[in-house]
């Protein structure tokens, strides 16, 4: 790539870091950003900056929240005897859209993958174990491959 397109190549590289985004998709995204007005590009950059600065993990379930504790964990309407363990915060949004589950959640922030050097200590497993007490009667392990499609 010519020297003067290095910033574009860097942008492609950054987008390609996202799971599920290959070089082709990352290149499309980079060109979309380049086609934005300066104002739109700055809004995108600020949205990323604010999300990184203002959101953090709920101290109970590890989902992302602006407060110390997320709305689901604070809700008195949730069934506190059931915890659904999920891989990522995305999974919570997916389950919540079904309106079928009314328990609590716990986000592991990944899966054990010895080939990738990810063991139990890199995940939020000890936080899950700390939540298990006499009020928790059921733990559901959510697996994407077994989740029903909400349109069926």
Where are these regions (language model features)?
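Extended interfacial segments that mediate partner engagement and assembly in macromolecular machines
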Residues: 26, 75-140
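Short, well-ordered alpha-helical scaffold segments within catalytic/effector domains
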Residues: 12, 55, 67, 122-129
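Conserved small/polar residues in nucleotide/adenosyl-binding loops
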Residues: 144-152
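Cys/His-rich Zn2+-binding cysteine-cluster or related metal-binding knuckle/ribbon modules and their
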Residues: 2-9, 17, 27-83, 88-92
């Amino acid at each position: 790539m010519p020297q003067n397109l290095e910033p574009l190549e860097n942008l492609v590289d950054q987008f390609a870091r996202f799971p599920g985004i290959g070089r082709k998709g990352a290149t499309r995204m980079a060109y979309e950003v380049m086609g934005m007005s300066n104002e739109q590009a700055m809004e995108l950059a600020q949205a990323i900056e604010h999300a990184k600065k203002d959101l953090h993990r709920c101290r109970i379930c590890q989902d992302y929240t602006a407060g110390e504790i997320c709305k689901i964990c604070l809700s008195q309407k949730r069934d506190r005897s059931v915890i659904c363990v999920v891989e990522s915060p995305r999974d919570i949004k997916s389950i919540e859209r079904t309106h079928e589950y009314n328990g609590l959640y716990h986000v592991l922030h990944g899966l054990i993958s010895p080939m990738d050097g990810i063991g139990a200590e890199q995940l939020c497993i000890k936080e899950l174990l700390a939540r298990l007490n006499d009020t928790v009667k059921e733990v559901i392990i959510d697996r994407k491959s077994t989740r029903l499609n909400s349109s069926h």
